[in-house]
């Protein structure tokens, strides 16, 4: 088997990846995610996940309607906990060991609090670590949370799954003339204001020389596995 150049990756999933038009958490979508996880593990690559909560709640949207932004962000972070528990449950049913870690303390044995040492130990043991609650603080996106967790666990790269197959000059869903980048520098992505990730996430990854790959897993669940095998898919952002 061709060995991947990556030993440990962090996969950033949106909450929408777990939903369909009828269900905020769709069993079929969950199983697709678990199959992707298993394909990564089969290549002897360790994987951690940061999951969003937009399928359940978006604090920023309700803030525009008058809700206190801090309250909305706290509610959004709680939504990510529900998504993380759902992924972990289906993983366990498929004999994939997991460890769920939250950015803020949750009692009652629901999940562990973030501890980068314990997270790395779990990854070394072959477990999938699922991070939730973003950074644990309001006013930060889950993209920034993904960058932070990737740095904490010494990941080789952040893989962000999106609706499109990379980073484009403009939104390809709205503009059919948009062109896809094969690769970008962090400075270029920030200067061009390409809003596939927020500036804080790009800046953190740039500072720590942490590669980002933006790709789509909507049409082909093998895309991440293919990238790990060296196929030139998606858009790579690096120094």
Swiss-Prot record:
Keyword annotations: ATP-binding, Cytoplasm, Kinase, Nucleotide-binding, Pyrimidine biosynthesis, Transferase
Record InterPro entries: AceGlu_kinase-like_sf, Asp/Glu/Uridylate_kinase, Uridylate_kinase, Uridylate_kinase_bac
Residues that, per the record, bind UMP: 53, 73, 135-142
UniProt record, GO biological process: 'de novo' CTP biosynthetic process; UDP biosynthetic process
Compartment(s) of residence: Cytoplasm
Reaction(s) this enzyme catalyzes, per UniProt: UMP + ATP = UDP + ADP
E.C. no: 2.7.4.22
Biochemical pathway: Pyrimidine metabolism; CTP biosynthesis via de novo pathway; UDP from UMP (UMPK route): step 1/1
Record entry for activity regulation: Inhibited by UTP.
GO cellular component: cytosol
GO MF term (any one): ATP binding
Residues binding ATP: 12-15, 54, 58, 162, 168, 171
Keyword check for Protein transport: no
Main subcellular location: cytoplasm
Tree of life domain: Bacteria
Subunit and interaction comment: Homohexamer.
Entry-linked HAMAP family: PyrH_B
Family: Belongs to the UMP kinase family.
Physiological role: Catalyzes the reversible phosphorylation of UMP to UDP.
Protein name: Uridylate kinase
Native organism: Ruthia magnifica subsp. Calyptogena magnifica
């Amino acid at each position: 088997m061709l060995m991947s150049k990556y030993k440990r990756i962090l996969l950033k999933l949106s909450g929408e990846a777990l939903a369909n038009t009828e269900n905020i958490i769709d069993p079929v979508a969950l199983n697709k995610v678990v199959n992707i996880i298993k394909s990564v593990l089969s290549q002897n690559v360790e994987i951690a996940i940061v999951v969003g909560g937009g399928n359940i709640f978006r604090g920023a949207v309700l803030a525009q309607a008058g809700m206190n932004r801090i309250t909305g962000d706290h509610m959004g972070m709680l939504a990510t906990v529900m998504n993380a528990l759902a992924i972990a449950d289906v993983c366990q049913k498929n004999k994939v060991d997991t460890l769920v870690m939250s950015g803020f303390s949750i009692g009652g044995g629901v999940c562990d609090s973030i501890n980068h040492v314990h997270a790395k130990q779990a990854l070394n043991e072959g477990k999938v670590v699922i991070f939730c609650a973003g950074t644990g603080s309001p006013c930060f996106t889950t993209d920034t949370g993904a960058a932070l967790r990737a740095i904490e666990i010494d990941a080789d790269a952040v893989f962000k799954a999106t609706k499109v197959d990379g980073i484009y000059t403009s939104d390809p869903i709205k503009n059919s003339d948009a062109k896809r980048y094969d690769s970008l520098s962090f400075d270029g992505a920030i200067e061009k204001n390409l809003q596939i990730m927020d500036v804080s996430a790009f800046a953190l990854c740039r500072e720590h020389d942490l590669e980002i790959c933006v790709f789509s897993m909507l049409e082909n669940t093998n895309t991440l596995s293919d990238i790990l095998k060296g196929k030139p898919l998606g858009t790579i952002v690096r120094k």
